[in-house]
């Protein structure tokens, strides 16, 4: 059962680069420092509430800050080379929470697989990491409607020598396959017939790129967006054309969204109202575009249909 969007983390392979040239290890160290300050400064915000639908929004307004659980994953939520919090989810959170009367956002670092446990244990207030909405996760948290939709793609060596374009190719050509810890792509590969115990699990797309470049694997599977972004500075690897994985024999489209504790329906609903205003005005696309999102990633998918296992 998947715990993470796309992810619990495994030990790194080699030196993990990110697309800014900073190692992921140092990136997470920077996030940790900021997160520690945020946890100290907001320790009383996330106390339990007996109010129906929760009163977290009122408490966040009073505190003036919301703590965002992020996983240090480009482009979803990370600390940039200047030490600033950015990514599609934090930038969207800034806009929406400002509209809701909360002036500041504060990053709290987490391994991807620890985001839901951290949310449930009130380490942070909201998960802002581009987390995929799926039935398993919907049993543990509640989601806003997706702010983006996403297909899959592979990282392969230049020229794609094995001709790998989907999970069926990976199985039929007996390719050495890797993906990220807890990524939904594990399920997609297994559904296509790949033996789960043969999958190399790495922390993220940067480690996946390293593994492909070093020849440890033939292919790494991730989102179309993250794979095309991470290979931009690589002379040895490329991203394949985006494709929809098959789930129960049907093409599946994922959607990423903010996650909230199940008791905080009032906050989730207020967030959704502002999110839909941004969608209607086109401002959502303007916020996400600098992070590599295209109009093809804009979506009308709902959390309700994804929680029910639908994909459009």
Give the location of each predicted region:
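Short helix-initiation/N-cap motifs at beta->coil->alpha
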Residues: 106-117, 200-210, 214
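Extended ligand-binding regions for polar small-molecule ligands
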Residues: 43, 90-99, 160, 168, ...
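Extracytoplasmic small-molecule ligand-binding "clamshell" domains
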Residues: 50-129, 139
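N-terminal secretory signal peptides
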Residues: 1-22, 30-40
């Amino acid at each position: 059962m998947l715990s993470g969007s796309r992810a619990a983390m495994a030990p790194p392979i080699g030196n993990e680069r990110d697309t800014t040239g900073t190692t992921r290890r140092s990136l997470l160290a920077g996030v940790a420092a900021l997160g520690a300050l945020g946890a100290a400064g907001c320790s009383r915000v996330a106390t339990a509430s007996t109010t129906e639908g929760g009163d977290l929004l009122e408490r966040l307004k009073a505190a003036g800050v919301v703590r965002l659980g992020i996983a240090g994953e480009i482009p979803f939520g990370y600390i940039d080379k200047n030490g600033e919090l950015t990514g599609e989810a934090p930038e969207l959170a800034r806009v929406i929470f400002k509209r809701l009367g909360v002036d500041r956002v504060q990053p709290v670092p987490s391994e991807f697989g620890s985001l839901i446990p951290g949310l449930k244990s009130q380490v942070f207030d909201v998960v802002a990491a581009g987390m995929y909405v799926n039935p398993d996760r919907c049993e543990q948290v509640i989601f806003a409607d997706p702010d983006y939709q996403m297909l899959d793609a592979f990282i392969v060596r230049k020229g794609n020598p094995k001709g790998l374009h989907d999970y069926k190719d990976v199985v039929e050509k007996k390719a050495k396959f890797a993906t990220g810890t807890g990524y939904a792509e594990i399920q997609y590969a297994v559904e296509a017939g790949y033996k789960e115990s043969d999958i190399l699990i790495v922390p993220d797309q940067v480690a996946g790129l390293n593994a492909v470049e070093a020849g440890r694997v033939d292919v790494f599977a991730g989102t179309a967006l993250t794979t095309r972004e991470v290979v931009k500075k690589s002379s040895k690897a490329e991203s394949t054309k985006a494709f929809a994985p098959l789930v129960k024999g049907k093409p599946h489209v994922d959607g990423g969204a903010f996650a909230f504790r199940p008791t905080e329906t009032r906050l989730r609903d207020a967030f959704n109202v502002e999110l839909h205003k941004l969608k209607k005005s086109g401002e959502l696309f303007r916020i996400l575009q600098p992070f590599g999102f295209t109009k093809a990633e804009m979506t009308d998918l709902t959390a309700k249909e994804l929680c029910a296992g639908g994909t459009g």
